[in-house]
Amino acid sequence: NAPDLEEIYALDVDPARPDHYLFEGTSIPLQQEIVQVAYKNGAGVSTESREFWRTPLGPVIYRDNGKVYIVRAAADGDYRGGEQFLRMMRATSLAEWKDAMRMRARVTSSFTYADRAGNIFYLWNGSAPAFPHPSGGDTSAVPAHRTADVWTHYVPFDSLPHLLIPPGGYIHNENS
């Protein structure tokens, strides 16, 4: 699988305020974060500071020529992967296991479920964005001026590739 799990968007800089971008006709400030990291430097410890910028849509990856480029990535900031695995392991039925999978905290992976009741279920559980536009791929940014230009949700869970109780009675998978 090679799903498209992220998109690069080009936002217009507010010409009157260089640390703001224009979205939905409003000037919105970029969020600045200074990160300090201590590291070993010979016998001592040094500290290095870096400045990062972000928007609610995703982190800024580049700024130039009146544009702010951001990357919007599936599951960015979602740290519930461990919780999802725990819920999967504790599931006592296919319905409970599917509920755990609906968390979509695992960005991409194939999963197999089987139980004593004879259920065998295969699922590619990707957090694939439902793009409202053709993807820019890895080579071009998609212009974003309003919410309708930006992906805001994933492809529905029940639309993901899956197979329940295969006709042959088993599943062979070398991708999990």
State where each predicted segment sits.
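Mature extracytoplasmic enzyme cores
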Residues: 1-176
